[in-house]
């Protein structure tokens, strides 16, 4: 422990002297109030400290005490359904302890409740050899999540004691005799430094798709479990709603939602909506699998920088248990702005648009912690982290540094488009500019699992949309009537795909989520219409005849998005009806 004194205060940056025995990334208690800070730069005996609480009223001469520990999170039962701030302070217990709706400075509250008792059920017995990552036992944390208590990193040996029963997170639950003869006493809780990724046995290639229930994503721009995706877009394009939809309906075990520097009302929406929503996979409330980290725009700027790391470390902990985890960061641009502010106060040489030169490496550091892995331990298990980051480029300009550095790392780009949002086409993901480098892997995975021709259908649908884009300029110049019959059909089918398939109402109880079988049935109907109508045109039918003769079935295709999942056969039955009506048009020989 080292004690120094403050010599300079500049917003969230405090410089202290007499810190020659301190280390970089040490946590400090700053001033008489004991504010939480982290050393980010050392020069001789002077330490630059970024303070995670409001520094007004702090002055030169006040003491700074180091703890000798890096910024760490507590990992154990009690994380699920909890809401933390950027440095893992539990906001509900913080409010009860301080009787204030605002963050009172200098208050230290443990992240995990020290009084709550958890029923521990051992899975191993005394005398067994254990290594780091082995599951010792379980705690039923919520109705959905079984919390698996693991042997901490760098601990291995013989299990000499393990107890069943109700324990707090600090009670000794098991004892391991290490190779050197010392006894390690373990509890339900472990700590981990947030800036250090948790070790794994092996990194694997992600192949299984993350089903989000959003048709434009699952069909055209899928992300895998263990993948990384970016959602850039201007203000009002729907980034937060896309993130909320994935957090609600993604087929993962755990969701970590990090509200980083965004509006407080958005976190309020999450708190109001999530407890009422039922997870379609488990039938329980979505909050039963969610961890919230709220670091809104009016909270100290330095804590934004920590909140992303806090979230990904908690995600890694659940991944190590063998769960699939999705982490949403909304928004990484606010995190980058916090880096820029601290870099400016440190008087570092600025890079593009004032961001620090190390912006790219910090963004890469975060996204590289996602992935599909084989975890540590003698028991074979896999876990995944899917990282989805919203990016808020000023004015929607995706050439700015945060977006460009993000796109260099992630494999999925869901580009939100202001013109689409203004036309009230939501989700406003532009199908011409977005991309997914997982498309081929996901397509072959689905074809193999479902025994269907899914990837071919997706390719055909995208070809129709791209053909429409090339025809639009001709239509604007000389009108729709100047097109050939086949091109007019292409324009009509493309409109069907856009309006009846890609458009999705997040606030409709049925349309908000579409399962994969329903997506396939809906897309098959539209493509069947295109195929049968093309055949009819080649046999001499007119475009107008086909459109008038199939008006009823096309209307039913348009309404199929509002048919509940349990009535899926109704949607599948439309395929035969499409063929029948077009054959009827041909049989009549004109209308």
UniProtKB/Swiss-Prot annotation:
Keyword ATP-binding: yes
Molecular function GO terms recorded: ATP binding; proton-transporting ATP synthase activity, rotational mechanism; proton-transporting ATPase activity, rotational mechanism
Function: Produces ATP from ADP in the presence of a proton gradient across the membrane. The V-type alpha chain is a catalytic subunit.
Gene3D superfamilies per the UniProt record, alphabetical: 2.40.30.20, 2.40.50.100, Bovine Mitochondrial F1-atpase, Atp Synthase Beta Chain, Chain D, domain 3, P-loop containing nucleotide triphosphate hydrolases
Family: Belongs to the ATPase alpha/beta chains family.
Keyword annotations from UniProtKB, A to Z: ATP synthesis, ATP-binding, Hydrogen ion transport, Ion transport, Nucleotide-binding, Translocase, Transport
BP term (GO), one: proton motive force-driven plasma membrane ATP synthesis
Residue numbers binding ATP: 233-240
E.C. number: 7.1.2.2
Any one annotated GO CC term: proton-transporting ATP synthase complex
Keyword Ribonucleoprotein recorded: no
Name of the molecule in the record: V-type ATP synthase alpha chain
CDD domains per UniProt: ATP-synt_V_A-type_alpha_C, ATP-synt_V_A-type_alpha_N, V_A-ATPase_A
Pfam families hit by this protein: ATP-synt_ab (PF00006), ATP-synt_ab_N (PF02874), ATP-synt_ab_Xtn (PF16886), ATP-synt_VA_C (PF22919)
InterPro entries documented for this protein: ATP-synt_VA_C, ATP-synth_a_Xtn, ATP_synth_asu-like_sf, ATPase_a/bsu_AS, ATPase_F1/V1/A1_a/bsu_N, ATPase_F1/V1/A1_a/bsu_N_sf, ATPase_F1/V1/A1_a/bsu_nucl-bd, ATPase_F1/V1_b/a_C
UniProt lineage: Bacteria, Bacillati, Bacillota, Bacilli, Lactobacillales
């Amino acid at each position: 422990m080292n004690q120094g004194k403050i010599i300079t205060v500049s917003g969230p940056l405090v410089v202290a002297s007499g810190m020659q025995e301190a280390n970089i990334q040490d946590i400090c208690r700053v001033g008489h109030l004991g504010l939480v800070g982290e050393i980010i730069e050392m020069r001789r005996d002077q330490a630059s400290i970024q303070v995670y609480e409001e520094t007004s009223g702090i002055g030169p001469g006040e003491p700074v005490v180091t703890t000798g520990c890096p910024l760490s999170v507590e990992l154990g039962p009690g994380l699920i359904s909890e809401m933390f701030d950027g440095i893992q302070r539990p906001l509900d217990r913080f409010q009860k302890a301080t009787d204030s709706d605002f963050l009172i400075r200098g208050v230290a509250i443990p992240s995990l409740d020290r009084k709550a008792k958890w029923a521990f059920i051992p899975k191993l017995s005394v005398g067994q050899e254990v290594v780091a990552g082995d599951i010792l036992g379980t705690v039923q944390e919520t109705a959905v999540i079984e919390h698996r208590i693991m042997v901490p990193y760098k601990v291995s040996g013989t299990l000499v004691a393990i107890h069943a029963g109700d324990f707090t997170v600090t009670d000794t639950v098991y004892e391991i005799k290490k190779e050197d003869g010392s006894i390690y006493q373990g509890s339900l809780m472990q700590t981990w430094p947030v800036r250090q990724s948790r070790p794994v046995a092996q990194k694997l290639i992600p192949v299984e798709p993350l089903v989000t229930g959003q048709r434009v994503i699952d069909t055209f721009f899928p992300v895998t479990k263990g993948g990384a995706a970016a959602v850039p877009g201007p203000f009002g394009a729907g980034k937060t709603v896309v993130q909320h939809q994935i957090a609600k309906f993604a087929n993962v075990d755990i969701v970590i939602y990090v509200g980083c520097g965004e509006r407080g009302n958005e976190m309020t929406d999450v708190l109001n909506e999530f407890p009422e929503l039922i997870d379609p996979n488990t039938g329980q409330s979505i909050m039963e699998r969610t961890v919230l980290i709220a670091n809104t725009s009016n909270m100290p700027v330095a804590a934004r920088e920590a909140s992303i790391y806090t979230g990904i470390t908690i995600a890694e902990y659940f991944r190590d248990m063998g769960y699939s985890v999705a982490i949403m960061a909304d928004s990484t641009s606010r995190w980058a702005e916090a880096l820029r502010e601290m870099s400016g106060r440190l008087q570092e040489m600025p890079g593009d648009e004032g961001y620090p030169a190390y912006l790219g490496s910090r963004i890469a550091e975060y996204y590289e912690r996602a992935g599909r892995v084989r975890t540590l331990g003698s028991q074979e298990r896999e876990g995944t982290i899917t990282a989805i980051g919203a990016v808020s480029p000023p004015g929607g300009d995706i050439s700015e540094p945060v977006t460009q550095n993000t796109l260099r790392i992630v494999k999925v780009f869901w580009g939100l488009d202001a013109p689409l949002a203004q036309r009230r086409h939501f989700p406003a993901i532009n199908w011409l500019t977005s991309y997914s480098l997982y498309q081929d892997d996901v397509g072959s995975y689905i074809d193999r699992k479902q025994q269907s021709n899914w990837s071919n259908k997706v390719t055909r649908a995208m070809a129709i949309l791209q053909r429409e884009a090339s025809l639009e300029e001709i239509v604007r110049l000389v009108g729709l009537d100047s097109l050939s019959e086949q091109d007019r059909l292409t324009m009509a089918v493309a409109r069907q795909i856009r309006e009846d398939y890609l458009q999705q109402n997040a606030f409709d109880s049925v349309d908000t989520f579409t399962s994969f079988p329903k997506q396939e049935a809906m897309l098959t109907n539209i493509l069947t219409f295109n195929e049968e109508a093309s055949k009819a045109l080649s046999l001499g039918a007119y475009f107008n005849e086909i459109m008038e003769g199939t008006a009823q079935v096309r209307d039913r295709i348009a309404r199929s998005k509002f048919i509940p999942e349990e009535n899926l056969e109704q949607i599948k039955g439309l395929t035969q009806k499409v063929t029948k009506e077009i054959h009827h048009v041909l049989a009549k020989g004109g209308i």
